[in-house]
Regions:
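N-terminal cap/lid segment of alpha/beta-hydrolase-fold proteins
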Residues: 1-24
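The serine-hydrolase catalytic nucleophile loop
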Residues: 39-47, 172-175
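Primarily recognizes the serine-hydrolase "nucleophile elbow" in alpha/beta-hydrolase
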Residues: 81-148, 154
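Short amphipathic alpha-helix adjacent to the substrate-entry channel of hydrolases
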Residues: 42-60
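Catalytic nucleophile-loop/oxyanion-hole region of alpha/beta-hydrolase
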Residues: 41, 63-97
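C-terminal catalytic histidine-bearing segment of alpha/beta-hydrolase fold enzymes
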Residues: 186-237
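Short beta-strand element of the alpha/beta-hydrolase
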Residues: 25-34
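The feature captures the conserved acid-bearing segment of alpha/beta-hydrolase catalytic domains
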Residues: 125, 131-186, 191
């Protein structure tokens, strides 16, 4: 595997590339980490990307503007530019554009959902982990966002969502439930896994991504990843 980074046109934004040479074009996932627009959560980034590459995916991580440069619209632009770059370089990156999707965690889930609902989206599938859906925590994050559930249409790509019912940062009723209701109303295929308990910001929920914060290791919630792979094989491949 070769790891590289390219700068995007959006200032303070770049794309980490985890490319595995392949004789055939592979599925690919664009990872949009969380971090409340204050940081790029490393727990959601390289270790998630490397895990995807071990399952025959090409993987990418979008680094969008954060801290004093944080801006919701700029972050959305960075995600769109990342997809444009990958599709434009699909041959050399061994990517199958028909199996290219986005996965977002927390605030990154908000960005992933927003991008997937653009009319020009290049995402063929979406995965959202404990996503921010409504602008209920804008003050905490220091940005002005939007209610991405209102962006859903019948053209929204098939979506996989997971989180925990007792998530105190993105409460189920305000966020995941609001989004899945709109998916159902528009006839968008989706699969939802809301675990009974579990922390926010849990990434893969295993010891690999929870190496620093052991409270982010949860054997039960870690089931989301094999469930996603099963869903992908049935719905997308």
């Amino acid at each position: 595997m070769q790891i590289s980074n390219v700068q995007l046109d959006q200032p303070y934004s770049s794309l980490d590339i985890y490319h595995s040479a392949s004789d055939v074009a592979l599925p690919a996932v664009v990872i949009v980490p969380g971090g409340s627009y204050q940081q790029i959560k490393e727990r959601d980034s390289e270790r998630v990307a490397i895990t995807f590459t071990t399952h025959a995916f090409q993987a990418f991580v979008v680094r969008y503007p954060v801290l004093e440069h944080r801006d919701y619209q700029a972050a959305k632009t960075a995600v769109a530019q990342a997809f444009d770059y990958i599709v434009d370089h699909a041959t050399e990156l061994d990517v199958n554009p028909d199996q290219l999707g986005v996965i977002g965690f927390s605030a990154g889930g908000q960005l992933a959902a927003a991008y997937s609902n653009q009319t020009a989206t290049k995402a063929k599938f979406v995965a959202l982990g404990y996503p921010v859906i409504k602008p209920t925590i804008d003050d905490r994050m220091g940005v002005k966002t939007e209610d991405v559930s209102q962006l859903v249409t019948d053209q929204t790509p098939a979506t996989f969502i997971w989180g925990s019912v007792n998530d105190g940062l993105t409460p189920y009723l305000d966020h995941v439930n609001a989004y899945t209701m709109m998916l159902a109303q528009h006839g968008v295929p989706f699969e939802l896994h809301e675990f009974g308990t579990g922390n926010h910001g849990i990434a893969l929920a295993n010891k690999y991504t929870g190496i620093v914060n052991r409270d982010r290791v949860d054997r039960h919630m870690s089931r989301w990843f094999p469930l996603f792979l099963e869903w992908f094989a049935e719905v997308i491949e």
